[in-house]
């Protein structure tokens, strides 16, 4: 249940209690069997489908508020739930249940000359705090992934999706209860006041082990600057698609249209198109024509405008903008070297793709660009944990510590060492 900011209890006290409950739930959850966790996940998926009408009604309240507040179309798209999206949420939870349990997996082992046998074993992180914007599906994905990895989780979604997230959370709790797991293993922050985020970033008195922010630049920047606990940063997706002179034009057209227009409001949508200057006269117009016919606004450099006058002039700001909308910035570059220079200058290190047939060109793209996900002859919209076979993702980490790329169940674990001896002493 969500509480307004003028509640009788102080927000710090409320959040401290949330942290205490999460910490208490984390201990039994860390040793829960795979069967228990999978039972909880499948029961949660059932509960979501059974509560379909309630979830849709809650979502209608959120959508009405978003319309009243004049939110952008891309924002409303991410907020919107329908029959198909609810089915997809349930399917994603079931897919997570089918994944191998990472907890207890021996990821390396070796013997020492003195007879000690050493094992590196996956363990839960503990309590994860997830702070995200108004995407109701993240409530389900994050809750399910953390559960599978044996972690308790505290979910703080955007206030604009409060009703939808609360309805989904209710179904997740039913899943926990069906498997006799602690209901506090998946909690939703019970207040909409932003001060609750500040309390989470302080760590709730040592209760939170890691924070995962999922949202725009301002949210992630705040988390990174204020957090007193480790952070898995999910930065904006300024994703690039480069069309090399060796590319198959038909393939390039299909990929460009999908990378930008399949869903414009997701972090894996292409925001900048780079075309090899050597094939601009033959490749640029067909590709941009497809995008324009699909309703995409083209913003191009002066060279692009000369070849495709229907484009609008691009500004310097465009090259570092995540549109999350039917807009794309377009530039011509001097082959793979020019593409690498442009991407390394403007990228958020999320996802980049190349369409090319030349193996050496592809090798340079893979070796010289330092982004979390690099694709060859495939759409940037495959930058997704589900598409990677992870079941779902809690976000796409763009940093370099611990987790990078799609954050699935394995990335939500740590490890410990088990050392077996037969009486050895160092002496």
From Swiss-Prot:
<dbReference type="InterPro" id="IPR016163">
    <property type="entry name" value="Ald_DH_C"/>
</dbReference>
<keyword id="KW-0963">Cytoplasm</keyword>
<comment type="function">
    <text>Catalyzes the NADPH-dependent reduction of L-glutamate 5-phosphate into L-glutamate 5-semialdehyde and phosphate. The product spontaneously undergoes cyclization to form 1-pyrroline-5-carboxylate.</text>
</comment>
<comment type="similarity">
    <text>Belongs to the gamma-glutamyl phosphate reductase family.</text>
</comment>
<dbReference type="GO" id="GO:0055129">
    <property type="term" value="P:L-proline biosynthetic process"/>
</dbReference>
<keyword id="KW-0560">Oxidoreductase</keyword>
<comment type="pathway">
    <text>Amino-acid biosynthesis; L-proline biosynthesis; L-glutamate 5-semialdehyde from L-glutamate: step 2/2.</text>
</comment>
<protein>
    <recommendedName>
        <fullName>Gamma-glutamyl phosphate reductase</fullName>
        <ecNumber>1.2.1.41</ecNumber>
    </recommendedName>
</protein>
<dbReference type="GO" id="GO:0004350">
    <property type="term" value="F:glutamate-5-semialdehyde dehydrogenase activity"/>
</dbReference>
<keyword id="KW-0028">Amino-acid biosynthesis</keyword>
<dbReference type="InterPro" id="IPR016161">
    <property type="entry name" value="Ald_DH/histidinol_DH"/>
</dbReference>
<keyword id="KW-0641">Proline biosynthesis</keyword>
<dbReference type="InterPro" id="IPR016162">
    <property type="entry name" value="Ald_DH_N"/>
</dbReference>
<dbReference type="InterPro" id="IPR020593">
    <property type="entry name" value="G-glutamylP_reductase_CS"/>
</dbReference>
<dbReference type="InterPro" id="IPR015590">
    <property type="entry name" value="Aldehyde_DH_dom"/>
</dbReference>
<keyword id="KW-0521">NADP</keyword>
<dbReference type="GO" id="GO:0050661">
    <property type="term" value="F:NADP binding"/>
</dbReference>
<dbReference type="Pfam" id="PF00171">
    <property type="entry name" value="Aldedh"/>
</dbReference>
<dbReference type="InterPro" id="IPR000965">
    <property type="entry name" value="GPR_dom"/>
</dbReference>
<dbReference type="InterPro" id="IPR012134">
    <property type="entry name" value="Glu-5-SA_DH"/>
</dbReference>
<dbReference type="GO" id="GO:0005737">
    <property type="term" value="C:cytoplasm"/>
</dbReference>
